[in-house]
Amino acid sequence: DDARMGYSLYNYVGGIPTSLVDPTGLHWETKDFWDHYMNGKGRTVTLKEIGLSVRFWMSIPVMTEVYEHMLAHSAYLKKKVKDECRRTNGRVGSFATTFRKKTVTDVTGDVFMTPIGNSTFFSEHRCMILPNCCEGRFEYTCSSHYYIRDWFENPFDIGLEHPKGTIYRINGDWHVPAKGSATFK
């Protein structure tokens, strides 16, 4: 983008575009994370309020982790139903189950999310299961909660805090319903 032709979508160093900028000003950049560290008095922020919720959720590292969590949950459900059918000799009724998983996402490759960095990523899947043991299938209704509980701390990456800065939490939450049927062996 040529600056003479209107608003530029890039930051420049020595006339060379180095990174995209947010023309709307709706999401935080590194300077905003620093400003909150120095002046926010430790108040927790959410990805939604700082304009990075969709960007985080749609990033390749996070989508990959969501997919991995879904695969693990699917395998868990099939094993759980099979075990319940075996335990009750095929006479199991509907039952509730919960599956939890924790991993780490790395979004440092996105210039806008570098301050979020490596985040602990959680999922919790609560389901109602209606098995049909004779046919080897089941119906499910689930509510999946994906979330991060992160901190903005150690901004120099040397293990020290700035004497005037205050560590603060960065949280993000997403809820996804699911309903369907599956088979098990």
List where the protein language model places each region.
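Short turn/helix-capping motifs enriched in Asx and small/polar residues
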Residues: 1-28
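Catalytic toxin/effector domains delivered as secreted proteins or via bacterial secretion systems
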Residues: 35, 39-40, 44, 52-185
